[in-house]
Amino acid sequence: MKSLLLGSAALSMLVGMAGIAAAQEYKIGISNTVQGNGWREEMICAMKAEALASGKVASLNIAHRNTDAAGQLEDIRNLIQAGVNAIVVNPANADGINAAIKEATDKGIVVVAVDQAVTEPSAYILSNNQEQYAYLGAKWLFEQMGGKGTVIYMRGAAGAGADNDRDKGFKRALAEFPDVEVGQEVFTGWQQDQAKQQINDIIAAGVPFEGVWTSGIDNVIVDAFVESGTPLVPIVGADNAGFVGQLSSVEGLKGAAVTNPGSVGGAGVALAIQILDGKAPEQKLVLVDPVLWDNTSDDGKALLAGAANPNLSPEWPVSVSIPGWTNYTMDQIIACKGPGE
């Protein structure tokens, strides 16, 4: 009996070791549809860093290009053919890639949507709360405007799920301030050059406005005011390193940064690994709630000072990790290296 027990224990140990070895051979696919954007670049680096830090991922297969839902459908199907165990996707829109997601999950592939939601029920969603992101910033802005006047509404990419959700949040805040009106509404495409040209054109037109809400393309908006000598108005942006620095350094600027961590990509990889390890969460939707850091209150100034990081690209969010989800170091995300690189 004693010998049998020892044999069983040894067998259990071998089975356990085999399980660990198998866990270290996960292949994870990544699908992203926007390049040339600092937020998305940080997201990709967070995915790589988390995969490396986990010690459980053998390789990443990354489809990272500028495309639409049709192109992303093709990318996801290619990842399915490549034999990945999981796919982490930042969707082009909420329902445009549902068919490919369903094809993946029908084959037992775990699918996690990050940053913005999808409507396919077989997918897991780990997203920044985009509606609340817009609401917090817009409400603060309208209060700074004294509850009246004209706001410039600088949105993201037309048709993107995150932009649609942010529009709901912005309009929810707008409904609370009937004396605030939208002077101009533009889509920046989340591209810095495009947004800067748009605000320069608006400034040059000479139409008065009292505030600017941006969907995260922010530091170049401040640059446009400073370079043109235009009097500053309150500006809302995201927690991008450049804008966070400006909120502490640009004289006369009143503004607020709303957190929207690109590191949600790393959290999505962590969730995919957790599910592959047999530890799927009870709920398929996880929202990361934003926080507002303003430079008009002592508490806000302290938060901005603590978050500032001059070592990051100006376009990268300073929230480079998400407590309870990501496990990599600052050096690892900045290095932007995944398994085998």
Language model feature labels by segment:
Residues 17-23:
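Sec/Tat signal peptide C-region and signal peptidase I cleavage site
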Residues 77, 85-105, 170, 188-247, ...:
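Hydrophobic alpha-helical
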Residues 39-53, 133-137, 161-180, 198:
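Short, solvent-exposed amphipathic alpha-helices that sit
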Residues 28, 72, 126-151, 165, ...:
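Hydrophobic alpha-helical segments within soluble ligand-binding/sensing domains
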Residues 94-132, 150, 241-254:
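Flexible loop/hinge segments that line or gate small-molecule binding clefts
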Residues 27-50, 54, 60-74, 84, ...:
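Extracytoplasmic "Venus flytrap"
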Residues 51-65, 150-153, 174-192:
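Short beta-strand elements in bilobed, periplasmic/extracellular small-molecule ligand-binding domains
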Residues 25-26, 173, 271-341:
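Hinge/cleft segment of the Venus flytrap/periplasmic-binding protein
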